[in-house]
Structure formats: C-alpha cells, structure tokens
C-alpha cells in the first residue's frame, strides 16, 4: 500500500511507514494512492464481521503485510459486535459502543495497536494523542501494557465527562495523561507542534493515535460494511448514513467505504454548535470560530483534522461536495431529541441523538437511514439522567474505573512544558 502526503504529494510512504510516522511533512495527512474497487460486494456482505474485515483490509493494504499476520490483527482487534437496531420505520442505529471502552474508537484504537506492534521494528515508541473524550480511553486500553510503547494523552481540563476521564486516567503503567488548561483545539495544536519538532520526534520515537493515523481510519471502514450487511436486502439500494462529526475521521472512513463500492447513496455530517463544516458547505467560506462547550463534548472541535482527507476523496472521485448533507443541533435541540427518542423506546446519548435528528430532518421517503451511535449512554450518565429523568446503571467496566483515583498531571497550554515532559517520560 502506497500513500502520499496531501500537502506534499511527492512525499510517498508505505503503510508501515505511515503507521509508524503518523503525520507527514508540515503536518500533512497521509492518504492512499489507490483505493481499489471491490467487485464482490454482495459476497462480502454475506460474511461475518471479522472474516469480511480481513478481506477488506487485505485489499486496502495490498500484500504489504502477510495475510496471516493481518488476519490475526483483525481477529485480535474486533472482538465485539456492532449491532444494527431499528429505531423507527426506515431509521436504524449502528451501535458502535460494545467494545471494552464503550465507544466507536475501540475499533480503530485496537487495530492501530495491533498494526503498530506488527510494523514498529526495534526501539521505543511514544504515542502522543489528544482526546475530546473517547479517543483517550480507546487508545489507553488498546496500548496498555505493551512493551516499549509509552502513551501520553492530552485532554482539555474540565471539558470531558467525569466517566470518560476515569476510563483512561486511572491506568498508570505505560499510560500517562495530562489535563491541559485549554480547549481541545489547543490540545491538537500541541500535538501538531510536537510532530513538527524533528529532534523531539527522533528522540522519543513519536507517533500519534488520533484519527490522523491511517491505521485507525482503515479499521473504521469495516463497520460501515457491517451496517449495510445487517439491513434487509430490499433496503440496501437507497442508504443514507448520518455521522456525528468532530474531527471528521469517522466520515472519512465512510467515504472510503463508499469508494470501495459499498452501496451508500449519500452521507450526512452532523455537528453540534461547533459547526465549521455545515457553515462552509452552505457559504463556501472556511471560518472556524472559537470552540464552545456542548453536551456532545467529543464533537467540540472547530478545526477538524481530517477535513483535507474528505475534500481529497470528493475531488478524486469526481463527487460534488455540495452532495454531502450536513446539519447542526443546539444543546436544547439535542435534549428535545433525546426525549423524543426515549418516547420511541430507544435510549441514546447526545452525539447519537444529533446524528439521528439531522438524518430524520433530511431523509426522503424512498431512503433508508442509518445513524452512528458512537458511545454508550452511560458514558454521559450525568447529562442523560438529568435530561431524561432516569437512573442509568453503570456497565461493569465503567463502574470498576469509576472507583479508581485519577492519575493525571496538569499543564498549561505551553509547548515548552510539554516538550520537557515528553523527554523525561
């Protein structure tokens, strides 16, 4: 598999190099030179998740890893289901929260850990990543205890849910967590500064586990196939998928699935008040505003890292960017939507609720809608209980971590401090 740097197309790397490096020159994102057209989609849709994913990832990575190695990586990573649940006539929820940290990022985080272990070679690696909520837990649990890999996770202090924080800030060992006195965009900027520091990168073997790492995106492609595979065959012709969007990695993965030949008619990018992309699609002006805190904190992102990949896919496929649906919900609208979903017998959380409502508003009578549920409602226990007036029992994994003390360090939004911290980690 060959990839190129979107900013500097002359910079070309293999899959193994892209996994190890994370980012290219000038913080450029790596992107596959070729995305093959799969001609056996119907056959693939008949297979179970793991076997189908082994074939999809085998086609994408294209022989760079032995198929037996890749098969083992997928089998070890995808140890949990992604069920499709009917919410109402023609609208389905793809539940991506049945993994060990109860969020969709378990798919990408666990596959990336497997990939890095397979291609890293000798020497220590430091994973530096920023999280607005779920990435931190998925990465921490995927890499916890792996030899010669240290993990440092930055997150905005006070801007993620207490349960999210407990899931990744209580492990210790090779997992270090840092609460930054700033918002998530500032955390991402610190990560990018670290990657621009060539001396630092070489000194600590720097890598990233954010969705900028191609291995995470490729893993996420697989659950779009799983969604369509669970639909009745008569409903597979006019499928619309609504994706709750923050950094836009999830949407990028869906667009790669469509490029491979998965029959998805169109996508809808659903955001909260941090609506840089919906405004851009309407006006043509890229105008990120100051990030605001919302109920759906994992989408509190004003400068989405993966947007260049989205534009690259539209350009390469000859698609019109205006065909990408979009919409946003305020917090009060999100609360109303959660109540409406509860009345239909479906318990959700803010991110999934936004994806549901934006989909419902834009779905045509002839279409079948799927919205992505990216986290278990209990991960947002306080807000969901307040809004719906219910008591949510904690799943066992959350309850266990909720009893443990936080092990985080705290730091100002200061790259010099972070650099010194990384060098002594």
UniProtKB/Swiss-Prot annotation:
Transmembrane segments: none annotated. InterPro entries: Ser/Thr_deHydtase_PyrdxlP-BS, Thr_synth_N, Thr_synth_N_sf, Thr_synthase-like, Threonine_Synthase, TrpB-like_PALP, TrpB-like_PALP_sf. Its EC number is 4.2.3.1. GO terms for biological process: threonine biosynthetic process. Its cofactor is pyridoxal 5'-phosphate. The modification N6-(pyridoxal phosphate)lysine is found at residue 105. PROSITE patterns: DEHYDRATASE_SER_THR. Pfam families: PALP (PF00291), Thr_synth_N (PF14821). Keywords: Amino-acid biosynthesis, Lyase, Pyridoxal phosphate, Threonine biosynthesis. It is an enzyme of class 4 (lyase). Pathway: Amino-acid biosynthesis; L-threonine biosynthesis; L-threonine from L-aspartate: step 5/5. It comes from the Bacteria. PANTHER family: THREONINE SYNTHASE FAMILY MEMBER, THREONINE SYNTHASE-LIKE 2. Belongs to the threonine synthase family. Catalyzes the gamma-elimination of phosphate from L-phosphohomoserine and the beta-addition of water to produce L-threonine. This is Threonine synthase.
């Amino acid at each position: 598999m060959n990839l190129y740097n979107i900013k500097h197309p002359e910079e070309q790397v293999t899959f193994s190099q892209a996994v190890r490096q994370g980012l290219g020159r000038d913080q450029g994102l790596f992107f596959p030179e070729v995305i093959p057209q799969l001609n056996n989609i119907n056959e693939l849709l008949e297979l179970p998740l793991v076997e189908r994913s082994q074939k999809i990832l085998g086609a994408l990575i294209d022989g760079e890893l032995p198929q037996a190695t890749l098969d083992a990586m997928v089998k070890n990573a995808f140890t949990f289901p992604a069920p499709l649940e009917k919410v109402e006539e023609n609208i389905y929820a793809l539940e991506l929260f049945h993994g060990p940290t109860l969020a969709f990022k378990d798919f990408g985080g666990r596959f990336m850990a497997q990939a890095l272990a397979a291609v890293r070679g000798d020497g220590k690696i430091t994973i530096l990543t920023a999280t607005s909520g779920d990435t931190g837990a998925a990465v921490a649990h995927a890499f916890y205890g792996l030899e010669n890999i240290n993990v440092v996770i930055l997150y905005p202090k006070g801007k993620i849910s207490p349960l999210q924080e407990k899931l990744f800030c209580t492990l210790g060992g090779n997992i270090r967590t840092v609460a930054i006195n700033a918002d998530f965009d500032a955390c991402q900027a610190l990560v990018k500064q670290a990657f621009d520091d060539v001396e630092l990168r070489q000194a600590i073997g720097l890598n990233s586990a954010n969705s900028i790492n191609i291995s995470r995106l490729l893993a996420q492609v697989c659950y779009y196939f799983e969604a369509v595979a669970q639909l009745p065959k008569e409903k597979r012709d006019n499928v619309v998928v609504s994706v709750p969007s923050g950094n836009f990695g999830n949407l990028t993965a869906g667009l790669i699935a469509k490029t491979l030949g998965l029959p998805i008619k169109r996508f809808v990018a659903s955001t909260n008040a941090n609506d840089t992309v919906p405004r851009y699609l309407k006006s043509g002006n890229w105008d990120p505003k100051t990030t605001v805190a919302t109920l759906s904190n994992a989408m509190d992102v004003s400068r989405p890292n993966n947007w260049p990949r989205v534009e690259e896919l539209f350009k390469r496929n000859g698609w019109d960017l205006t065909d990408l649906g979009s919409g946003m919900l305020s917090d009060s609208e999100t609360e109303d939507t959660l109540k409406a979903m509860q009345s239909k017998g479906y318990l959700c959380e803010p991110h999934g609720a936004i994806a549901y409502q934006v989909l419902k508003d834009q779905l045509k009578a002839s279409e079948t809608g799927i919205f992505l549920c990216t986290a278990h409602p209990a991960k947002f226990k306080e807000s969901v209980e307040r809004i719906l007036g219910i008591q949510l029992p904690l799943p066992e994994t959350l309850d266990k971590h909720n009893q443990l003390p936080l092990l985080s360090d705290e730091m100002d939004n200061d790259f010099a401090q972070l650099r010194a911290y990384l060098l002594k980690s």
